[in-house]
Amino acid sequence: MNVISKPNLFDSARATGNPQLLERAARWYELATKNDFGNFVEVQNVFPTVDWVSDRLVFNLGSYRLICGVSYRRKAFFFKALLSHAAYDQGGWKK
């Protein structure tokens, strides 16, 4: 799968100042780009903690949530946000 936009993903991870998050984001990116997902179940097989919320996928990266749009036809994840649990729980990202 393609990840759009890789720079935004890593810039957001760096901005937290959390080196573990940067490592988790790199691991997620590696797994995401090595696979060719055709549906949510296939994503779940690689990322067991992923959730499908509205039209987005929410990945658990430790104490952060990675929110992506997805197009299985275009073979792409679309980076939307990388949020702490507290920010994620506020729900503003759903708009």
Regions found by a protein language model. Give the residues of each.
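Basic, Lys/Arg-enriched alpha-helical interface segments
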Residues: 1-65, 71-78, 85-95
